[in-house]
């Protein structure tokens, strides 16, 4: 299963380490991970978002790291997933077991907010 890893990047000093650790944990569970933190620095926000949307489209599911609600980019990704019907899961729950058995999703949170 291909998993896109969504979460806060801008303004987070150790984002690469956080994303790498999450990627490693997911990989150890057998997932193929699309990690946006590997993208090079120096591009525009629009360029990053275009690449990330393509990554999301290539993934089977999107998993959201802690603090994603505080990231403008991750909120855009969550909205995109919500409106296009993509499966989304909180990272903590994916790490607990089979993603197909997970009930609490980013879409659940998005629906509660409106």
Locate each region found by the language model.
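Conserved catalytic or regulatory cores that recognize and/or transform ribose-phosphate-containing ligands
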Residues: 1-114
């Amino acid at each position: 299963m291909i998993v896109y890893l969504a979460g806060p990047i801008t303004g987070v000093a150790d984002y690469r380490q956080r994303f790498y650790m999450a990627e490693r944990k997911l990989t150890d569970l057998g997932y193929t991970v699309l990690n946006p933190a590997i993208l090079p620095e120096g591009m525009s926000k629009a360029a990053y978002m275009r690449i990330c949307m393509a990554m999301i489209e290539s993934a089977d599911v999107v998993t959201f790291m802690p603090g994603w609600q505080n990231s403008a980019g991750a909120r855009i990704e969550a909205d995109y997933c919500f409106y296009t019907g993509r499966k989304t899961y909180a990272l903590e729950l994916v790490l607990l077991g089979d993603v197909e058995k997970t009930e609490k999703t980013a879409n659940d949170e998005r629906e509660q907010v409106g």
